[in-house]
A protein has these predicted regions:
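P-loop NTPase nucleotide-binding module
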Residues: 1-9, 159-165
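P-loop NTPase motor domains
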Residues: 16-25, 29, 33-183
Length: 183
């Protein structure tokens, strides 16, 4: 109903028709990994776009640390300092340059750069996570197809970012979050 919002995480496309029928957006997260370059319909995420805000920068530092730990990196105080320094420098760049590739250029640790490589535009997950401009629906009904994402090493990073974005949209209006066939 008017003023409410729905976020649905789907597996197998069972919510697609309902979401589109309600005037919502349906995003195929796994399909974005295999989309052709320049496909304007594919989901494209820019997790570092808002790091000029100190709270967003702190969130990004934690998100990156978790993502890199998933790649086998030991995130010690030195690694955290490298991440924070690069994020702080990147925060002053124009929004279109606040990408994971932009972060990699500024990182002073070769090990962190190597661990970040799969998430850069030239890596297997870059088409989804290293956009210069975010393409993610803004409708009050959002459905995210996760089937093609399940099993991918990027799944945790993608879902953590999406839940962070959803958290930013929680404004007191009635909200439903659906996790269909969750794991």
């Amino acid at each position: 109903y008017k003023g409410s919002q729905i976020f649905a995480f789907d597996f197998g496309g069972s919510i697609r028709a309902a979401a589109l029928g309600m005037g919502g957006d349906w995003q195929d997260l796994g399909g974005a990994l295999h989309a052709e370059e320049g496909d304007s319909a594919a989901v494209a995420l820019q997790p570092l776009a808002r790091i000029d805000n100190a709270g967003e920068r702190a969130w990004a530092a934690e998100w990156l640390a978790a993502m890199l730990a998933g790649e086998g990196m030991v995130i010690d105080p030195a690694a955290k300092e490298h991440l924070w320094s690069a994020l702080t420098s990147l925060a002053s760049a124009p929004p279109a340059e606040r990408t994971l590739t932009g972060l990699a250029v500024l990182l002073q640790s070769q090990e962190l750069k190597q661990a970040l490589a799969p998430y850069l535009i030239c890596g297997p997950w870059g088409r989804l996570l290293d956009a210069e401009q975010e393409r993610l629906g803004e409708a009050s009904v959002q459905a995210f197809e996760t089937e093609g994402l399940i099993g991918a090493s990027s799944a945790a990073a993608v879902l953590a970012y999406l839940f962070h974005r959803i958290e930013g949209r929680l404004d007191g209006s009635p909200t439903m979050i659906i996790i269909d066939e969750g794991w």
